[in-house]
């Protein structure tokens, strides 16, 4: 089943160039010196939090985002990425609060809706997660990610007919996405619809996916 991965790069540009851990640590050292001179600089704090995230220092990043939000309680970048960091640290209630606050200000932001739905799933609030994913599809009917997220949730709930519909919609929007095809095939295999599963995999191969990349699912076919 396809896992919808939430990557902390979707609201503001957080540095597109790859850096080594040493380079990130060096960046932090420089930013700390700059913050000593300009402690009220929101831009510097956001940059330091970015470096903290890239080093997996989520507590430090949360601290920086919290300082930003004390200065600007509607700073969307700080709100969104603090929610992301809380999720990484399994502070799910706090992540939920940040996502909900973010969406109050910016209600049409797909990744924040998906982030909130993910947190609701982690909190075991299945009905609330379903409602949030339904909202995603209504707000973003042209997003394959919205359909895929709902399909993944439905698959977990063993609502296979509903999941198949959503995997089909996701594939309609991204027909060459091999992970979507594999996810649909996985559901068909669970339903013991072997022929349909094989056809789904074969279609993915025709779209250009190497057969070896789908070996795991081909091996499950009877």
Question: What is each residue range found by the language model?
Answer:
Residues 22-25, 186, 190-222:
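Terminal, low-structured helical/coil segments at or just beyond the last alpha-helical repeat
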Residues 31-36, 69, 103, 137, ...:
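A conserved position within tetratricopeptide repeats
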Residues 42-43, 76-77, 110-111, 144-145, ...:
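Helix-start (N-cap) detector for alpha-helical repeat units in TPR-like alpha-solenoids
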